[in-house]
Amino acid sequence: PRGPLRPLCRPINATLAAZBZACPVCITFTTSICAGYCPSMVRVLPAALPPVPZPVCTYRZLRFASIRLPGCPPGVBPMVSFPVALSCHCGPCRLSSSBCGPGRAZPLACBRSPRPGL
């Protein structure tokens, strides 16, 4: 049997960016995020029932890690926390921990020139 054309929901490594308006440097770092295909059902006939939310690839288990932005002035917290995916599943989107919009062709990027971090 043929598998799906797109990889199923799983943790993958991704390079993200962290910056703060008050700090002069943007850092790029690598973490694991949830990404991939989630099977969904589409109603063939219009129904009187409300639409069923489509499942998204989201965190099942995660931990948080932190990095320090260099060069922040006194009084500005230089620490930035980010999620690290330990496992993923297809489920409802939780806006508290996930970006539920359409996938991006480009990763999140810095507004200023990035400096490699972790």
UniProtKB/Swiss-Prot annotation:
Keywords associated with the record: Disulfide bond, Glycoprotein, Hormone, Secreted
GO molecular function: hormone activity
Glycosites: 13
Subcellular location: Secreted
One GO CC term, this protein: extracellular space
PROSITE patterns: GLYCO_HORMONE_BETA_1, GLYCO_HORMONE_BETA_2
Predominant subcellular localization, coarse grouping: secreted
SMART domains for this protein: GHB (SM00068)
GO biological process, one term: G protein-coupled receptor signaling pathway
Lineage top rank: taxon: Eukaryota
SS bonds (residue pairs): 9-57, 23-72, 26-110, 34-88, 38-90, 93-100
Family indicated by similarity: Belongs to the glycoprotein hormones subunit beta family.
Functional description taken from the UniProt entry: Promotes spermatogenesis and ovulation by stimulating the testes and ovaries to synthesize steroids.
Subunit field text: Heterodimer of a common alpha chain and a unique beta chain which confers biological specificity to thyrotropin, lutropin, follitropin and gonadotropin.
Name under which the protein is recorded: Lutropin subunit beta
Gene source species: Balaenoptera acutorostrata (Common minke whale)
This protein's encoding gene: LHB
